[in-house]
Amino acid sequence: MRIGFMLRNLREPGGIQVYTHNLLEELMALESVHEFVMLYPDAQFVGHFGSRPRVREEVVRFPTRLGWDQLAIPWAAHRLDLDLIVNPKLSVPVFAGRPTVFTLHGAEQFAVPEVFPVSDRFYTRIMMPIYCWRAAAVISTTRMGVDEIVRYVGADRRKLHPVHEAAHSRFRLLQRADLAAIRERYRLPERFVLFVGGLNPLKNFSNLLRAYQKIEGQVEHALVAVGFLRWKFAEDVARIEELGLESRVVRTGFVPDEDLPAIYNLADALLLPSLYEGFGIPVLEAMASGCPVITSTTGCTPEVAGDAALLVNPRDVDDIAHAILRVLSDSALRTRLIERGLDRAAEFSWRRAAEESLRVYEMAARRGRRAE
């Protein structure tokens, strides 16, 4: 089978990019007879996967994103004689002429619509039902995601397949001697709690700052924020100054994946009280690195974290503040969260995700052929 992957999102930093890279790396490592065709919107990524056996790279150009998805990809699929088209994010060609599969990374536009621009909400509410209808199969990164897409858009549950993500193997316990260079590179304080993610309203960074301000005089820890700036980030950045926290909040900006494990190892807790996460990969990355986790009762993070994290109401500033104090002051709780977190992270595997995804692709291709 010749499988084409729509890889327009490789340039977009964040969870979907991490998912795409890790999934493709493991898919190509499997002993498989299938050929993988990487479809890029430009030549920027040519050579990224091309040295692998059974991998072909193709540049498919089109001036607009929607046109690339709906016009250029079907044309390329016909020219390349693809058996299946896969998109690691939301979107598939509506008239592809062959089976399609996409991965759903959450239904946040339905769950918390108030934080999204009207244009985003309109696009998702119109197009998601169409994509689900046209796709031969849909992969969701959580079981909750399956339930949500059935509830919000009436998708056919028989098409939906939960496949969990995982932390990359680079996230692990490191020797303290290996951490000094990273501390110096990013000018990290001696004691700190950590936030990881792109700044946008979903991440609830403003409430995290308010919670941190409430306990500022009770802890010696700084707050380190790792990640890039996303939409509506200006409000979060302004909140730091508004709350008088300029000297206690360290913003590193974007950090390469190779440096993140050391930062997790140095942190005394990960704080991820998001309004919604479609998976929440930092939860598993922190756990695998021996970092206690505080995350939300909402979204998909409870499914990912299990009993290995402290869960808080993300809209309750006092609840977040109390949880931070508990983790930093209760050594028995910290030890329990670290031990459970290491065990929990070990339950997830990118190899298993690749194997399960490939089975979905094979099933979708068979289903599509029967429908012809």
Role assignments for model-derived ranges:
Residues 1-372:
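Carbohydrate transferase catalytic cores enriched for Leloir-type hexosyltransferases
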